[in-house]
Regions:
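Short conserved active-site loop signatures built around small residues
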Residues: 49, 70, 194
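Short Gly/Thr/Asp-enriched flexible loops that form oxyanion-binding sites at enzyme active sites
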Residues: 71-85
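Glycine-rich phosphate/pyrophosphate-binding beta-alpha loops
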Residues: 138, 142, 195-209, 274
Length: 296
């Protein structure tokens, strides 16, 4: 086995010195003790995790760990998708959506050792606007919150920060008109957000699509229609209660392929990373596109 570890020194450690060195030393020590051939790399910029993972694949890695948050996992996953190299996760972000869905331990040594011993599995990948995602994507309000949340370059970025940003933006955000073509039907919606879920949750235990499965060959489309800010805030508690399907103005469907159109360019996110797209976005699922290893 040849293992590579790609470390994001910023994830979960903004402003703390020496994090990259400590994480690299820990990973190297664990893999050396396990007798595993390895390479440990630290990212230096956005997009670097993808480059390092591609390099690891070219050098014969059979397992590449992403040590970071959802964005780091997305970059490494994109580098490994449709190939024979498996993804391992050492969660260190603010949401850790895919890691939570896979029940990956937060403790780095447990995550490392557990994945080394685990059997490989495959999960689906989603695609929207030409960008792959493995946990969730979204259009509208949740994409705006992702952009606002990620613009914070220092300090803590946990659940409280996310909820604070969302609550503040909710009172000025206007729902938009969308045309959604899915499963041979076309619908028109004035929506707060349109989520595409590969897994059940955004992260931090916020369940957006309770019926989603990582290996069912489908995406879960969730449309949250526009309502008053106070009504949305009241219903938002259901994200933490796993009861969102019971909320008024929430539409859910399984889909393999869909198109979303609007009159203005669409802001969307892939695994929490915001992207500005055109006025039409096509989304699809790629069944079994990514190999993973997770602790049993």
């Amino acid at each position: 086995m040849h293992v590579a570890v790609v470390i994001n020194p910023i994830s979960g450690a903004r402003g703390r010195p020496g994090v990259a060195r400590r994480r690299a030393e820990l990973a190297a020590a664990v893999l050396t003790a396990e007798g595993v051939q390895h390479a440990v790399q630290v990212t230096e910029r956005a997009g670097h995790a993808y480059e390092l993972a591609r390099q690891a694949v070219a050098e014969g890695a059979t397992l590449v760990f992403a040590w970071g948050g959802d964005g780091t996992v997305n970059e490494v996953g994109c580098a490994l998708a449709f190939g024979s190299t498996a993804l391992g996760i050492i969660p260190a972000g603010s949401g850790n959506g895919l890691a939570r869905e896979l029940h990956v331990p937060r403790e780095p040594v447990q995550a490392l050792k557990g994945a080394l011993l685990a059997a490989e599995q495959v999960i689906d990948a989603g695609e929207i606007g030409g960008r792959l995602f493995f946990n969730a994507a979204g259009i509208g309000f949740d994409a705006l919150i992702a952009a606002r949340f990620n613009s914070r370059t220092h300090g803590r970025r946990g659940l409280w920060r996310y909820c604070t940003v969302a609550a503040r933006e909710l009172f000025t955000y206007e729902a938009r008109e969308y045309t959604i073509a899915v499963n041979g039907e076309t619908g028109y919606h004035r929506a707060l957000l349109i989520a595409l879920a590969n897994s059940r949750q955004y992260g931090n235990g916020m369940v957006i699509a309770s019926q989603a499965q990582l290996h069912d060959g489908a995406l879960d489309l969730v449309v949250v229609e526009g309502r008053s800010p106070l009504a949305i805030l009241w219903e938002a508690r259901r994200l933490f209660m796993n009861t969102l399907p019971s909320a008024k103005g929430v539409i859910m469907k399984k889909a393999q392929h869909l198109t979303v159109c609007a009159e203005a360019p669409l802001l969307f996110h892939v695994d929490g990373e915001p992207v500005v797209g055109g006025r039409s976005l096509t989304a699809r699922v790629h069944p079994g596109a990514l190999r993973i290893r997770r602790p049993a």
